[in-house]
From Swiss-Prot:
A divalent metal cation 1 binds at residues 65, 104, 234. Belongs to the GTP cyclohydrolase I type 2/NIF3 family. This is GTP cyclohydrolase 1 type 2 homolog. SUPFAM superfamilies: NIF3 (NGG1p interacting factor 3)-like (SSF102705). Homohexamer. One of its GO terms (molecular function) is metal ion binding. It comes from Streptomyces coelicolor (strain ATCC BAA-471 / A3(2) / M145).
Length: 285
């Protein structure tokens, strides 16, 4: 059975901390280096629900994509929700390790996992990492479809293949337009529009798209935009990371039991569609 320090060394080889953005907070948050690890849980968010899931599972290590403390704090009191997470982890001898922007740009990384979930063929990074001479690392991925789809069909595929959320998939653009090439980026993606336009793709699937960036992007060209829930676009990475750690465990004879969280931590819990006619309450006259 490996020690935590050995497992962390393996995770750091997959997602080196030095490749994280300067503002990010990655690495081991809680954990005793010499503690033994037999069971690991991967999740998107280090929130109480996933920590409780780790406790119930008997996990020794929780690996999350999002940081617990992205900004500094002066307290880990259990009266705060993040402090309660820390207390629960320590009381149950569960370590917490975070791989965030260093997993976004990895090869394979968050957007590779998203592309794989949608059966897209990855061509190259959307925003290449200049430090990678092979040009395989970077933010987002430019992809090709094996067979053309309409925007509507691509959105339906995303709704079917990604974890279900209240939001589903929002679309901007002609639903019947043909899509042969797609850019994808797990997590917030509306800062990447210049790169998407430069890539010359037919569609862009990401999360957290806002009104003004979408309006301006649509004014530039007829690019189709597909907006999924942030959590849903990053959850496939949990399966990828778990598979990678499984392979490492087998290679070293660690016999780790690696699990992927099924807890939905997307903060949106319901969706009510607008009335279809202009006579709906609140519609313009």
């Amino acid at each position: 059975m490996p020690r935590l320090s050995e497992v962390i060394t393996a995770l750091d080889a997959l997602w080196p901390a030095e490749r994280a953005e300067s503002w990010d907070a990655v690495g081991t948050v809680v954990g005793e280096p010499d503690q033994e690890v037999s069971r690991v849980l991967f999740a998107v968010d280090p929130v109480q629900e996933t920590v409780d899931e780790a406790v119930g599972l008997g996990a020794d290590l929780l690996v999350t994509h999002h940081p617990l403390y992205l900004r500094g704090t002066t307290t880990v009191a259990a009266s705060t929700f993040k402090g309660r997470v820390v207390h629960t982890l320590i009381k149950n001898d569960i370590a917490l390790h975070v791989a965030h922007t260093n997993a976004d740009t990895a090869d394979p990384g968050v957007s590779d996992a998203l592309a794989g979930a949608l059966d897209l063929n990855v061509v190259r990074p959307l925003v290449p990492d200049p430090s990678d001479p092979e040009g395989r690392r970077g933010l987002g991925r430019v992809c090709e479809l094996t067979h053309p789809l309409t925007v509507r069909e691509l959105a339906a595929r995303a709704a079917e293949r990604l974890p279900a959320t209240a939001q589903g998939i929002r679309v901007a653009g002609d639903p019947e337009a043909t899509v042969r090439t797609v850019a994808v980026s797990g997590g917030s993606g509306d800062s990447l529009f210049d790169h998407v336009r430069a890539a010359g793709v037919d569609a862009f699937l990401t999360a957290d798209l806002r009104h003004h960036p979408v309006s301006e992007a649509r004014a530039h060209n007829p690019l189709a935009l597909l907006d999924a829930a942030h959590w849903a676009t990053e959850w496939p990475w949990c399966e990828l990371g778990a598979a990678q750690l499984d392979e490492i465990s087998d290679r070293h004879g660690w016999d780790l039991r690696v699990h992927v969280s099924k807890t939905v931590t997307d903060p949106w819990t319901a969706h009510v569609a607008s009335a279809p006619t202009s006579s709906a309450m609140g519609a313009p006259n």
